[in-house]
Amino acid sequence: MTESVSKPVRPRAAVILAAGQGTRMKSPTPKVLHRLAGRTLLDHAIDAAEGLGCERIIVVVGAHSPQVGESARKRLGPDATVIQDPPLGTGHAVLAAKDALADFHGDVVVTYADCPLTTAPVIAPLFDLITHVAHVAVLGFEAQNPTGYGRLILAPGHVLLRIVEEKEADLATKQVKHCNSGVLAADRAVLFDLLANVRNDNAKGEYYLTDVVGLAHERHLSTRTAFAPEASVQGVNAQAELAAAEAVWQQNRRKALMVDGVTMPAPDTVHLAWDTQIAGGAVVEQFVVFGPGVSVASGAVIKAFSHLEGAVVGEGALIGPYARLRPGAEIGPDAHIGNFVEVKKVKVGAGAKANHLSYLGDGSVGEKANIGAGTIFCNYDGFEKFETHVGKGAFIGSNSALVAPVRVGDGAMTGSGSVITKDVEDGALALSRADQTSKAGWATKFRAIKQAQKDKKKDKKA
């Protein structure tokens, strides 16, 4: 879910840095296109920028990952990306966005596409600072282990004097636990004027964005720091860090849902998606997985080991255990979808039931209808999908196959084991199975013959 903050006082823009190689991920997928809660890291960063009210968003990408640029342009439009080539540091990356923002007059925030937990509310204090007291504002955090981070050298009142990178730090500076998240905000003109004067005379030969702080201080421009929890500014550079960020995100979202009145007996076992909507009064049992696009109404119960994606669950509905709702499933109020039932692109009416071992794909189930165990909506002929519609109050006998396109009318019934290939009119009973015959004594004779054959084989072996 995109978290928003109050309306901006001045126009805002964001420069999202997404040009890193991401080699430590050891994956053919670009780092920022890996997913957290079902959404790419890049999209999480864009969500934060949009939540801040940024009217312009520029994503800085590397020439090595065209997929990243394609993803950004697909969401933001054809002019949303610039290329940093060659990669010469964070300051150089932000400078790559200068021309794209030449006609923008307002405040700019620099963020990172690999920091999915750095949301709009986390960043928002920087805009408050540059609106009221600062020319440049930096987001900092207090690190339990500061090794590897740039250190914030502060004066009283969170006045920021300079940022010292780890490789440039002396022993005393390395003892400082106030660290730089990398997120920085300033007026556009101030930011790019300072960047134009950044030099690369450092251990890595790169142009550091952090050097703008020292330059600002030299020019008697005010610089300030806002602090955020360490967990909210952690970057993702390896698979283990992605898993750690996922765990933090899931924990935060589960807590928020429980505060809103959702019951979770074992919250640590529930996996949510970025846009999962669950109303207060709903119950989510153990080991439930939500993919993107799920909405659950108040009073619904999602029982253990169910999997939902792209589905709507109405008030008082009962799902599972071991149910699967796929995209397009709409479960009406007080409907039941039971164990080992799969529903895809089917609207299930209020009070309808499919309690056991069924596949319902493409179509509808009317109010109060009952779907017997083992029912299959046969929706695919190998080339096309077709729809099955079960009317209000209809009763589908166990082990029925409904071969689409077909309609079972209101109040109609099908006999168990039937293969229904033609429409069934309202109130009718449809049967399609061979007549049962009974041969008296046949089973007894069969067993006797088989036992004799078995005994004869034993005698030969003896």
From Swiss-Prot:
Origin: domain of life: Bacteria
Residues covered by region (N-acetyltransferase): 261-462
Associated pathway: Nucleotide-sugar biosynthesis; UDP-N-acetyl-alpha-D-glucosamine biosynthesis; N-acetyl-alpha-D-glucosamine 1-phosphate from alpha-D-glucosamine 6-phosphate (route II): step 2/2; Nucleotide-sugar biosynthesis; UDP-N-acetyl-alpha-D-glucosamine biosynthesis; UDP-N-acetyl-alpha-D-glucosamine from N-acetyl-alpha-D-glucosamine 1-phosphate: step 1/1; Bacterial outer membrane biogenesis; LPS lipid A biosynthesis
E.C. no: 2.7.7.23, 2.3.1.157
InterPro entries for this protein: Bifunctional_GlmU, GlmU-like, GlmU_C_LbH, Hexapep, MobA-like_NTP_Trfase, Nucleotide-diphossugar_trans, Trimer_LpxA-like_sf
Linker, as annotated region: 240-260
Amino acids binding UDP-N-acetyl-alpha-D-glucosamine: 17-20, 31, 84, 89-90, 150, 165, 180, 237, 326, 344, 359, 370
Pfam families for the chain: Hexapep, NTP_transf_3
GO biological process: cell morphogenesis; cell wall organization; lipid A biosynthetic process; peptidoglycan biosynthetic process; regulation of cell shape; UDP-N-acetylglucosamine biosynthetic process
Catalytic reaction list: alpha-D-glucosamine 1-phosphate + acetyl-CoA = N-acetyl-alpha-D-glucosamine 1-phosphate + CoA + H(+); N-acetyl-alpha-D-glucosamine 1-phosphate + UTP + H(+) = UDP-N-acetyl-alpha-D-glucosamine + diphosphate
Residues the record marks as active site: H356
Entry cofactors: Mg(2+)
Protein residues bound to Mg(2+): D114, N237
Subcellular localization, as worded in the UniProt entry: Cytoplasm
Broad class of the protein's primary localization: cytoplasm
Recorded GO CC terms: cytoplasm; membrane
Function statement: Catalyzes the last two sequential reactions in the de novo biosynthetic pathway for UDP-N-acetylglucosamine (UDP-GlcNAc). The C-terminal domain catalyzes the transfer of acetyl group from acetyl coenzyme A to glucosamine-1-phosphate (GlcN-1-P) to produce N-acetylglucosamine-1-phosphate (GlcNAc-1-P), which is converted into UDP-GlcNAc by the transfer of uridine 5-monophosphate (from uridine 5-triphosphate), a reaction catalyzed by the N-terminal domain.
Entry similarity comment: In the N-terminal section; belongs to the N-acetylglucosamine-1-phosphate uridyltransferase family. In the C-terminal section; belongs to the transferase hexapeptide repeat family.
Protein name in the entry: Bifunctional protein GlmU
Organism: Caulobacter vibrioides (strain NA1000 / CB15N) (Caulobacter crescentus)
